[in-house]
Amino acid sequence: MILKGLENIRMEGKDVMHSQVVMRGDIANINLGTYVIIKENVIIRPTFNKKHGSVQYVKMDIGDNVTIEPQCVIQASSIGSNVHIGKGCIIGHRVVIKDNVKILDDTVIPPDTNIPSFTVFGGKPAQYLGELTEAISQINADLAKNYYRNFVGLQAKAEPSAGASQASQS
């Protein structure tokens, strides 16, 4: 995992980052909500605006209960809560993804796209494929929380406690 500009990366807690994640906090602030799951080989790089011939980088906000599957490049300006981004997606500069959204695997979202709440997008380039029910917010929240709990449980099992190691030495 490579976290550049760590002082500019704010995590609310209960977040999981797998191996080979790159977060570019050295460019601009990155704010993560709770239960954000970032899987292998994901690059999170804040976006920029061009004004009067100069480039200004913009902070990135990622909401609660967000899962980003492996091999994605994320350059959005904001990702809402209860969002699932499939494997191999490219999220272009200044994209805004609202709450309760599903992005299918291998989707490419062009720069400056606004993804409305309760929608499914997929394809190259991304296009609207359908609506999600209001239940998706609870489904995505449960999935992210369960993933976190399982991840923490697996980590605890992988690290033997001091009492267990003493007992095995007796």
Where in the sequence are the language-model features?
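Extended, small-residue-rich solenoid/repeat segments and analogous flexible loops
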Residues: 1-16, 170
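Charged, well-structured alpha/beta interaction segments
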Residues: 6, 25-27
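Long, hydrophobic N-terminal alpha-helical segment
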Residues: 14-22, 32
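Glycine-rich hexapeptide-repeat left-handed beta-helix
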Residues: 26, 32-34, 39-62, 70-170
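Short HxH-centered metal-ligating active-site micro-motif
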Residues: 67
